């Protein structure tokens, strides 16, 4: 191997080890709906994004198999070549009906959706206003666009308005936010953000990755909780890989936006289409989440229970108000030690460290699902609290 490159890579890896930021891949096997086998140990799964337990649903499996038998294992090309099967149009129609929008575009992942939509719409003549805790894919999309990047303090509407006021009137303005923040479990103030975008002549993109399938009418997303709010949002992004239990993502809004992205979004144009099996499962999942209110109700109730009990025990869970519940520890070292002890006790609890979260805010990110029982959560909370006391970390 080229020696200068070897030296450079070895130095960087050593730095990651020293900083407690080195990452390993661990083999995981699904044992039951809420339990898994990780490194040959059975654990309660409190780390998954399978929020509604749909990944293992027999109806999705059957839909995936049927689509594979009809169309084959792979799409064989990009959508703009010969990979645009009728399944795509069926799913996109379902998304529009679900979200109340004019047109939709199914893409390969949430990451490529955010990187693609922002870098396609914005350029060096524009300004993008982004919440400081937005997902990395949003940040990467802004960097790739070359636009002026204005980060406002997390959920600080006064700071955002101050930035909007001082922005050049000649520049186009784009506001972008997560709706449910993936590492903190709190939510954006969508009504107020829409008011600001209208006041200052901006457009707004919302990332519903962790809200699609859960919140709002028929699980259409957090933007659908308040009447008429969704129609004031320019572009909605959501994923199929979390509550819907599948893979892929969507962008939806007014037809002109989607038509533009179809022609200009490089992460859409230059990639092979999703396999038919995925689309078949996605179509079934969209149908299920709109009808199965019980799953969504269970998830919300489980989140409320888990948050309340951790707060009662004295843990710092920030402003979490959803099914995503962090325990903020602080240092990488303490977080890794806590994670290791929890896994030894049979809880899949993964340490989240910089650059995923800000420096000095390393945490254990818990995610409850609709399939957890109160007994599961009570069992976990007892062990979490006991270990934290032993380690003298929180309680």
UniProtKB/Swiss-Prot annotation:
The modification N6-(pyridoxal phosphate)lysine is found at residue 242. Pyridoxal 5'-phosphate binds at residues 110-111, 182, 207-210, 239-242. SUPFAM superfamilies: PLP-dependent transferases (SSF53383). It holds the Pfam family Aminotran_1_2. Transmembrane segments: none annotated. The keyword Transferase applies. One of its GO terms (molecular function) is 8-amino-7-oxononanoate synthase activity. Its EC number is 2.3.1.47. GO terms for biological process: biotin biosynthetic process. Substrate binds at residues 23, 135, 356. Pathway: Cofactor biosynthesis; biotin biosynthesis. It catalyses: 6-carboxyhexanoyl-[ACP] + L-alanine + H(+) = (8S)-8-amino-7-oxononanoate + holo-[ACP] + CO2. Homodimer. Catalyzes the decarboxylative condensation of pimeloyl-[acyl-carrier protein] and L-alanine to produce 8-amino-7-oxononanoate (AON), [acyl-carrier protein], and carbon dioxide. This is Putative 8-amino-7-oxononanoate synthase. It comes from Bacillus cereus (strain ZK / E33L). The lineage of its organism: Bacteria, Bacillati, Bacillota, Bacilli, Bacillales.
